[in-house]
Every structure is written in structure tokens, then in C-alpha cells.
Amino acid sequence: MNEARIFGITGPPGAGKSTLTNALTKCWRAKGLRVGIIAVDPTSPFTGGAILGDRVRMGDLTLDTGVFIRSMGTRGQLGGLSPATAGAVHALDACGYDLILLETVGVGQSEVAVMEIADLVLVLNVPGLGDDVQAIKAGILEIGDLFAVNKADRPGADRTANELRAMLELGEDEKRPLPVLLVSASQGTGVTELCEELERQYLLLDGNGELA
């Protein structure tokens, strides 16, 4: 089936993934597209419960009939997603949604399952989370199709973006340059540009036959 475009949004905890998901959804809704959102939160290893708080940051979307939001706990599964994520994606696809956004828990070396489901993966970063060596250790550079530095109004945002660009240039096997954009999801700055770049990168991947 897979008529919907499936975009993964990942990055470290505190990067503003839910706020950005909310902002991007508004951008696509303004174009008349129906958007399904699957937001994954970590499950406690002690209680087995999960605080499904992603929808709190998307409260202004809850009355929009063109948006479906489903929060899930990881239930102990590694990979940054829930065991039920793939099934939920197929269900939303079957329901005719134009876009499906997968928001993962904080990503690390073992949390890259989103790249197996999504057509395209956006890796989000923010200033002040550590140096470039730590970013490489976290494994986030290997899974992204494009990158964004959120909270661009903070000091160090330009430096973080430039460091990411420098690290990405070290990749010798890349078939295409990987863009790094600056955005402030809470203020709306750069969101439209990111929305358009996501669509452009999807078309590039599709044209190159790189989509599953």
C-alpha cells in the first residue's frame, strides 16, 4: 500500500521533537493534507507505565479532523519505537492519510528502528548538547536524510549547524548532500522552509529509486 509519505522525526531528549511535529503539521494542514502522527514515549522499566505527554504539546491540533494523533509507549523495545508502531503506520496509510509522522524517543546507537519504517528521517539537534564527538558516538549522523538545529534563537545554534555540516562532509559514500537547516519550532521561524525541504528531499529519494 504505502501511498502515504512517512517521515521520521528523531533526535536527543529535549530537542523539541513534539513542538516541531506540531509546527510541521500545521504547515501541511495549511496545504490541505491529512496528517497522522505517531508519538512514542519511553516506558518505565520499573512500573511498566509511560507518560504519554507528546499530545500535551499538540493540544491545538486535537480538534482538527484532518489530524490523527496516537501516543505509544516503547514497552521495553529498543529502537526508539513501539512494537505496535508498524501496524499503526499501515492502519493510517489504509485510512488515506497523506503524511504520517513518526516521532521517536531520544535516539542513540541502538535506537534507529525509525529508518526501517520511514521513507525519510529528520534528525533534530539543539545547541549545547555536547561536542561533535558525542554526536558521532550517539549514532545520529548515520540515520538522517536531513538535519535541523532547533531552538535557533539560542546562542551557539549557528556553531552547532556548522559542526554538523562539517561532520556530514566527512561521509564519503553520500550520494547527495545532506542539508542542515536552522529552525525555532516554538517561534515558527524556519518551519515553512523545513517543511518544503522535507518534501524536496522526499522527491529526490523517490526520483533516485531509494524509497522502499
Residue ranges and their predicted role:
Residues 1-7, 12-15, 20-110, 115-132:
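Nucleotide-state-sensitive switch-loop elements of NTP-binding domains
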Residues 210-212:
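Short, intrinsically disordered, charge-balanced linker/junction segments flanking boundaries
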Residues 143-207:
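Canonical P-loop GTPase G-domain recognition
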Residues 48-54, 135-139, 162, 169:
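Active-site-proximal loop->helix
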Residues 109-110, 136, 190:
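Short acidic active-site motifs
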Residues 114, 127-155:
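Flexible active-site lid/hinge loop adjacent to a nucleotide/diphosphate
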